[in-house]
């Protein structure tokens, strides 16, 4: 039987939600992830240090006994985020980054930034204190085609931020295009990117050909297969700028299977298992450990995990749904099989 032992991985981008859903999302992510960057787009969002730290406490209260899982918190940037708030967040020791959501770009982003110039003072402070800048890299102009919004963001916005703040560490999150791969590859060592398992395994044909499959609908949206291949190439290249970020984003079944369904795919039930499939598909299992366990903490200037997990090449049946608070969530690969499992 094929086995693969790797240093315990981390998830550098996840949505854990809040309230009754928290016990279920934390249960899934804490099975074998050491740490996770927890997104702050709650209702209301975590726009200040106190709110983010209270959320940290709620997450920790749900970590199962015996798990060493540690949430890493993120501040939600708004037009009014002050340099003082950035310094306060950094001094907390629990908040490691601040997140740009262009207003209206994704789930619960209505409180986001309307004009980048409004956050330049905050970015200056982040550059000074060494706080990372996480970016949802899509424009929100309705005249821009949804499949082009990442590319246009990089060309018109991100390139300027990188030039204006050369010492600011920036993570372009959940990249979906060859354009993003090329930009990150060519940028300075202060620019990195996360890649999801579902963007490595799927493209827009999986979502749209032969019927609409709403559980593949996420933002940024799945792109054509040429972009998928570029992502696989980047992830499997060994380039230290690319690392694991699931963007696992649960929504109740009835909110996905609807006339106007929510964006987000749930992969926390089998994150590293799905990444193993993706890396195996390009004969690069030997590159999985760096992508999943080394590149992220190295970029964040955090220690790598010291223990290991073991993956076994053994198929298992994915349930059609998992509990999610008072509802259920339909995961990626629901009712089908995954080729790998964690021992």
Curated annotation (Swiss-Prot):
Domain of life: Bacteria
NCBIfam families: pyrC_dimer
Pathway named in the protein's UniProt entry: Pyrimidine metabolism; UMP biosynthesis via de novo pathway; (S)-dihydroorotate from bicarbonate: step 3/3
Keyword Cell membrane included in the entry's annotation: no
Sites of N6-carboxylysine modification: 99
Cofactor binding note from Swiss-Prot or TrEMBL: Binds 2 Zn(2+) ions per subunit.
Gene3D superfamilies in the cross-refs: Metal-dependent hydrolases
Annotated catalysed reactions: (S)-dihydroorotate + H2O = N-carbamoyl-L-aspartate + H(+)
GO terms for MF: dihydroorotase activity; zinc ion binding
Transmembrane spans: none
Assembly with partners or alone: Homodimer.
Residues at the active site: 247
Enzyme Commission (EC) number: 3.5.2.3
Binding site for Zn(2+) 2: 99, 136, 174
CDD domains: DHOase (cd01294)
Binding residues annotated for substrate, in chain numbering: 15-17, 41, 136, 219, 251, 263
Name of the protein in question: Dihydroorotase
Keyword flag Membrane: no
Organism: Shewanella sp. (strain MR-4)
Swiss-Prot/TrEMBL cofactor(s): Zn(2+)
Family: Belongs to the metallo-dependent hydrolases superfamily. DHOase family. Class II DHOase subfamily.
CC terms in the record's Gene Ontology section: cytosol
Keyword terms, alphabetized: Hydrolase, Metal-binding, Pyrimidine biosynthesis, Zinc
Function, in words: Catalyzes the reversible cyclization of carbamoyl aspartate to dihydroorotate.
Any Gene Ontology biological process: 'de novo' pyrimidine nucleobase biosynthetic process
